């Protein structure tokens, strides 16, 4: 069950940077802040549950890896963030690292 909690925590980790991005626009400032806080709390709570069965270092690395890769993809797909082959290689390395940590557990 810990890995399910951790996967969900990582996916929710993507929500708070999106909320902060929303908060940069005056019309959606408070909505964005609310989204960011709610996603932070939910993600943190699920990370807490995951750490009951997964070592802290592994859980934190996987959590941040999912969040970083997911936020990168959201930024590219919805916010027009710049891309390059090297940036995609970097994200692929993060994903490979997360997969390796899961296999090593």
Say what each PLM segment does:
Residues 1-105:
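Polytopic alpha-helical membrane proteins, predominantly small-molecule transporters/carriers
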């Amino acid at each position: 069950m810990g890995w399910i909690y951790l996967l969900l925590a990582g996916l929710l980790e993507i929500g708070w940077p999106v909320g902060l991005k929303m908060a940069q626009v005056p019309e959606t400032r408070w909505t964005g802040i609310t989204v960011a806080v709610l996603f932070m709390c939910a993600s943190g709570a699920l990370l807490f549950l995951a750490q009951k069965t997964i070592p802290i270092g592994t859980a934190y690395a996987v959590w941040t890896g999912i969040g970083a890769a997911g936020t990168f993809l959201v930024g590219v797909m919805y916010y027009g963030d710049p891309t390059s082959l090297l940036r995609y290689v970097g994200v692929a390395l993060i994903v490979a690292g997360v997969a390796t940590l899961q296999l090593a557990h």
